[in-house]
C-alpha cells in the first residue's frame, strides 16, 4: 500500500463490518447529521490520529495544541492569581485566554495552549487540582498535517 501518495484526490477503499457495527455507524451518522459514511469515517480517523500523536512521547515535540476549559468559584481566595502563576511557570505556551462570568459565583475560562503533551497535561492537572476549581477539561488537538 502506497501511503506517500502526493495526489490530493480522494481514494476509495472498502471496509468489511459486522451488521451490528454498520447499524451503529449509520445511527451515529443520523444522530450527528453527517452527510455520508465517508464523512464520519474521516472524522473518526482524524480523532485517532490526534490521539496517537498525543500518545507519542517526544519531549521535543512542541506541536501539540489544546484548549483547557476551567470553571471555578471566583470567590475562592487567591485562586485567580494561583491559576495565572501556574500558567506563567509552566513550560507550555499560553497563546490566549478568554474569561466569562457565568453567574455571580462562577467563572469560565478557556486557555489555549501549545507545547509538548507532558507539559500541557501537567498544567491541566495543576489547575484542576486547585481548591475552588469545579471543572477542568482538556480538549486535545495537533498541528500535524493531513490533506482534506
Curated annotation (Swiss-Prot):
Pfam families linked to this entry: NikR_C, RHH_1
SUPFAM superfamilies for this protein: ACT-like, Ribbon-helix-helix
CDD domains assigned: RHH_NikR_HicB-like
InterPro entries for the chain: Acetolactate_synth/TF_NikR_C (IPR027271), ACT-like_dom_sf (IPR045865), Arc_rbn_hlx_hlx (IPR013321), CopG (IPR002145), CopG/NikR_regulator (IPR050192), Ni_resp_reg_NikR (IPR022988), Ribbon_hlx_hlx (IPR010985), TF_NikR_Ni-bd_C (IPR014864)
The record's free-text note on cofactor binding: Binds 1 nickel ion per subunit.
Keywords assigned: DNA-binding, Metal-binding, Nickel, Transcription, Transcription regulation
Positions annotated to bind Ni(2+): 88, 99, 101, 107
Presence of keyword Nucleotide-binding: no
Cited NCBIfam families: PRK00630.1, PRK01002.1, PRK02967.1, PRK04460.1
Family: Belongs to the transcriptional regulatory CopG/NikR family.
Job of this protein: Transcriptional regulator.
Protein name: Putative nickel-responsive regulator
